[in-house]
């Protein structure tokens, strides 16, 4: 995160420097630097963002828009001595009207947005750096305290050792709690949202300024005008990086907070139960396989062949065994273990009733 913010600071500072150059061009910086900072040079005039200058070191007052033909700036041409016979009113290279020259104010607007973006990015970097430095100091102090307590505990007796160990545990828990609380990072999403808005506004204003330069000064646009492509590219990169950083923070928060235990098996809490509607596991550790309430294992109570004319009281597919049968998960050979020992009395009574029914049937026949 800090590396990403440092890269953002670097990109924004480069944009800020390049956007500053057209603003301080002629007439603000004129003869002192040889009129080298200009957007265009056409005829006897050199054009900047806030005004123009002539080749004989006469510059207009810094303001938005170039002076029209009736402006007092051109009064030097009315000299009776005829010192400026070749001068006429300033004419833009693209033959555009002077009203369009007021579009150059978007250079200043874009510079203001970029300045705010740079200050906010720098402030966020400093805040995160201070937060990280504050969390490291208590952690180091806690480690040093633990080391000192361990050294002192070795020199004490066994009773003092137990007391010191309990104290160290309490101190370590409290120190870890404070460190964990301090290590909780702040929510920087509002800062990123504001930075994203500023980067978009700065990108759009810089793009509009470049288009206005092309509209006014093509085909005599100087290197300073073409250099404005760099802030456009860098600001688009900054906007994309801010979107990626914001997305990564929201995804990390989603995984760590809302679905912390569902998405991380190593962080499953003991008190949190996982419910599954397809759960087929047994609660006591083994599986139970039964055929209803009865088992057809060792079925010896079916009627004999000699009594085939009698009604079938006990079909062959039903067992007279009335106990619950448990099949172990490790035993798949068909060996059944009866766990109905507590119901022997009821089982015997049931067998007696069956025998009486058989005897009555034989007596009738």
Swiss-Prot record:
Coarse class of the primary localization is: membrane
Subcellular locations according to the entry: Cell membrane
The chain's Cytoplasmic topological domains, given as residue ranges, are 1-3, 129-197, 246-365
Please indicate if the UniProt record lists Magnesium as a keyword. Answer: no
Query: Could you state one GO cellular component term attached to this entry?
Result: growing cell tip
Q: Topology relative to the membrane, per the entry?
A: Multi-pass membrane protein
Region labeled Disordered — which residues? 154-181, 327-346
What Pfam families does the entry give?
Answer: SUR7 (PF06687)
Which keywords describe this protein according to UniProt?
Cell membrane, Membrane, Transmembrane, Transmembrane helix
Which residue ranges run through the membrane?
Answer: 4-24, 108-128, 198-218, 225-245
Family recorded in the similarity comment: Belongs to the palI/RIM9 family.
Instruction: State the protein's name.
Output: pH-response regulator protein palI/RIM9
Which species is the source of this protein? Answer: Debaryomyces hansenii (strain ATCC 36239 / CBS 767 / BCRC 21394 / JCM 1990 / NBRC 0083 / IGC 2968)
The gene for this chain is RIM9
